[in-house]
Regions:
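Membrane-interface "cap" regions at the ends of multi-pass membrane proteins
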Residues: 1-40, 53, 57, 69
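Helix-loop-helix junctions that connect adjacent transmembrane segments
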Residues: 3-5, 42, 117-122, 148-207
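Select transmembrane alpha-helical segments in multipass membrane proteins
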Residues: 7-17, 50, 82-96, 127, ...
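Hydrophobic/aromatic residues within transmembrane alpha-helices of membrane transport systems
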Residues: 9, 23, 62, 203-206
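Residue-level recognition of transmembrane alpha-helices
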Residues: 17, 45, 89-90, 128, ...
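Helix-loop junctions at the membrane interface of multi-pass solute transporters
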Residues: 17, 31-33, 73, 77-79, ...
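Hydrophobic transmembrane alpha-helices that form the core helical bundles
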Residues: 32-35, 44, 53-128, 133-136, ...
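Hydrophobic core segments of alpha-helical transmembrane domains in multi-pass membrane transport
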Residues: 48-51, 128-135, 154-164
Length: 207
């Protein structure tokens, strides 16, 4: 069976995963998590990060033992040796990828409409069409574009942090803790925040 050529370097692969984490986790999910966890938003992201870290270490160990692209589909195929189960896993992965793409496209609409008042369906269709063309261009070219976008995203976050540092401090840390949400809200927000850490799975799938 012919194999795909390895065209991604380590920096491109790292930016490929980081782009998903920053784009989805910060620019799309931040408001949703803050709406549930309120002042405890940081705790929700910390909890989600700890859970995702365990999964990430598992993916890192498995991908080092089986250095082939495929991610979870490959791991299921090796573990159970059942072709039908691998196909089921592939369809599950495709479904979750479609849902992830829909979430990110929906989040992009809010930013786009700040500048141009187009309808949401039109923006989503155009964005999906552009992303399809980029993906069809090639994995290396897509990763380079993602790296550029990721640098812009990180630059935007640094700018926001710099501007926010100049603002007067309105609440003390004690007041923030007193206004924190309960454990139930933090846990619910952590489930949503977990989505922000899907980048490691993308990295394993294309490595």
């Amino acid at each position: 069976m012919a194999e795909l050529r390895r065209r991604l370097t380590l920096p491109l692969l790292a930016f490929y995963g980081l782009g998903s984490i920053v784009g989805a986790g910060i620019y799309v999910l931040l408001g949703e998590v803050a709406g549930i966890a309120q002042a405890s938003m940081g705790l929700a992201f910390l909890l989600a990060g700890l859970i995702a870290g365990l999964t990430g270490f598992s993916y890192a160990e498995l991908s080092s033992r089986y250095p082939k692209s495929g991610g979870s589909v490959l791991f299921v195929d090796i573990a159970f040796e059942r072709p039908w189960l691998s196909k089921v896993m592939a369809f599950v992965l495709l479904f979750t990828s479609a849902v992830s793409s829909a979430v990110i496209c929906h989040g992009f609409v809010g930013y786009f409409q700040l500048y141009i008042e187009w309808s949401s369906p039109l923006i989503i269709v155009l964005l999906c069409g552009v992303m399809f063309l980029v993906a069809s261009w090639g994995i290396r070219e897509s990763a380079i574009l993602i790296s550029i976008i990721t640098l812009l995203e990180v630059g935007g976050l640094i700018l926001v942090c710099f501007v926010a540092s100049e603002l007067p401090q309105r609440e003390s840390f004690v007041q923030i803790i007193d206004a924190s949400a309960g454990i139930g809200a933090i846990t619910a927000a952590a489930f949503i925040a977990f989505y922000a850490f899907i980048g490691f799975e993308d990295m394993v799938s294309v490595a």
